[in-house]
Amino acid sequence: MPDRVRIFDTTLRDGEQTPGVSLTVEEKVEIARKLDEFGVDTIEAGFPVASEGEFEAVRAIAGEELDAEICGLARCVKGDIDAAIDADVDCVHVFIATSDIHLRYKLEMSREEALERAIEGVEYASDHGVTVEFSAEDATRTDRDYLLEVYKATVEAGADRVNVPDTVGVMTPPEMYRLTAEVVDAVDVPVSVHCHNDFGMAVANSLAAVEAGAEQVHVTVNGIGERAGNASLEQVVMALKALYDIELDVRTEMLVELSRLVERLTGVVVPPNTPIVGENAFAHESGIHSHGVIKKAETYEPIRPEDVGHRRRIVLGKHAGRHAIKKKLEEMGIEVTEEQLDEIVRRVKELGDKGKRVTEDDLEAIARDVVGEVPESEAAVKLEEIAVMTGNKFTPTASVRVYLDGEEHEAASTGVGSVDAAIRALREAIEELGMDVELKEYRLEAITGGTDALAEVTVRLEDEDGNVTTARGAAEDIVMASVKAFVRGVNRLARRRRD
């Protein structure tokens, strides 16, 4: 097993082949910058010959002078390789299919012809002075003796790395281990693997390959890619670090940030139960689990959420226990007696039994009712009026009128959209309270269907003292849902300051 593994990210090439995904040049550059900041070794920027826009995107990324090696994909065809070279990449990833099914039905050529084409492609790319990585497409369904012959020949032709693609995800970890070990023994250059997730084993197969000596793994952010996707960058990286103790020069605390960026730009939603970066990756509802996590996080968490840029959440519902609810109340700054806590727990479970998702706002409302503390109507910030103007020919503008500790104040601001303008106006208004509140996270989801859907907005806010809170707002208007969430969050932070 190698001491260090290279991370070859193909989000911008194979990941963009996800059905329905198409990124602009600017979006691809933005993702490339973030990948470089994260620390991947290679960024496969695209397939330069595919289109003019793809060529421009690859060339733009190559011109960013990033620390990562910039790679372009090319068939073993001179025109493809020329396009990659013209895009000024550091590395050309050349490939040709080698399985009999691909040779017969797609390429319509013999094994001998494919071998000759592979050698010519590698030699041509190598003669241009770039790093050359060679892939035998559909390697895992290729005759083993022929596959090894192809790899040996391409290394002799000048390949700096060889890649073993499990193109349709048919391998099991033991089989992937055996194949990778054979390739490692056959060549004297680093071996890479590229695993697809058709049977849900892309990550497991990638790790098995590393155990067998592979020194590089192809991955995509959030595991996006054709069909069922590719090996997930975040899962492979954290497994290598946490389970194998293998050296990686990456900033794991950026994983969630990177995941959210790709989710936003591609429109491919990350399921909440996704390992490492999913919304529920560090969420606990069961009373037994949440009790354990509150006392000692390692009881039910294999890694720390902050190590990947995530946060721990104690979720309220019918499975929630006293310790979890008490901890949540403490975070809200609400002190309760044991008797009051019993009643709050009873009401929370009652809501959960009715199938209701118990939010922080629900818990706060229940607690205020039980404890009899200051009602929300007497909060530090009360929104009296908001007006937002937007259109296709002028900048979105928002004006607000609020009461701050009973005194009326007005503010206005512009923004990149209606929500941004409204939040900026509110931030300007609350400066009168001596508060500087930053919006750290924003999430929108439609609770119901249709154009009049009820929207729920979740915001995470942080004040100048580092206090953090999460608040939600729901309304049929996205701007109003956002404003409600922001005002509720500010009031929670203000209450903590007073306490």
Curated annotation (Swiss-Prot):
GO terms for molecular function: 2-isopropylmalate synthase activity; metal ion binding. This is Probable 2-isopropylmalate synthase. PROSITE patterns: AIPM_HOMOCIT_SYNTH_1, AIPM_HOMOCIT_SYNTH_2, PYR_CT. Belongs to the alpha-IPM synthase/homocitrate synthase family. The gene is leuA. Catalyzes the condensation of the acetyl group of acetyl-CoA with 3-methyl-2-oxobutanoate (2-oxoisovalerate) to form 3-carboxy-3-hydroxy-4-methylpentanoate (2-isopropylmalate). It catalyses: 3-methyl-2-oxobutanoate + acetyl-CoA + H2O = (2S)-2-isopropylmalate + CoA + H(+). Homodimer. Keywords: Amino-acid biosynthesis, Branched-chain amino acid biosynthesis, Leucine biosynthesis, Metal-binding, Transferase. It comes from the Archaea. A divalent metal cation binds at residues 14, 194, 196, 230. Its cofactor is a divalent metal cation. Its EC number is 2.3.3.13. PANTHER family: 2-ISOPROPYLMALATE SYNTHASE 1, CHLOROPLASTIC-RELATED (PTHR10277:SF9), HOMOCITRATE SYNTHASE-RELATED (PTHR10277). Pathway: Amino-acid biosynthesis; L-leucine biosynthesis; L-leucine from 3-methyl-2-oxobutanoate: step 1/4. NCBIfam families: LEU1_arch, PRK00915.1-2, PRK00915.1-3. GO terms for biological process: coenzyme B biosynthetic process; L-leucine biosynthetic process. It comes from Methanopyrus kandleri (strain AV19 / DSM 6324 / JCM 9639 / NBRC 100938). Residues 5-256 form the Pyruvate carboxyltransferase domain. It is an enzyme of class 2 (transferase).
